[in-house]
Each structure stands twice: as structure tokens, then as C-alpha cells.
């Protein structure tokens, strides 16, 4: 469940910024 919340948050951040590259960086940090 915690992972789901994190993925949802990352998606929201990516959608808000509109920068696809951000998702890759976030995954590396995870």
C-alpha cells in the first residue's frame, strides 16, 4: 500500500510538472 501511495505521488508530481524525465530521476532515488 505504501508503494502505491509513493507511485501515485510521483505520478501527480510528474503530471503537475509535465516533465517525463522527472519520473526517471525519482525512480533512481527510490
Swiss-Prot record:
Gene Ontology terms: biological process: proteolysis
Output the superkingdom of the source species: Bacteria
Q: Which UniProt keywords apply?
A: Aminopeptidase, Hydrolase, Metalloprotease, Protease
Q: What is its EC number?
A: 3.4.11.-
What detail does the entry give on cofactor binding?
Binds 2 divalent metal cations per subunit.
Family in the record:
Belongs to the peptidase M42 family.
- State what protein this is by name: Thermophilic aminopeptidase 1 alpha chain
Amino acid at each position: 500500500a505504501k508503494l502505491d501511495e509513493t507511485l501515485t505521488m510521483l505520478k501527480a508530481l510528474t503530471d503537475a510538472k509535465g516533465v517525463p524525465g522527472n519520473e526517471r530521476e525519482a525512480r533512481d532515488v527510490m
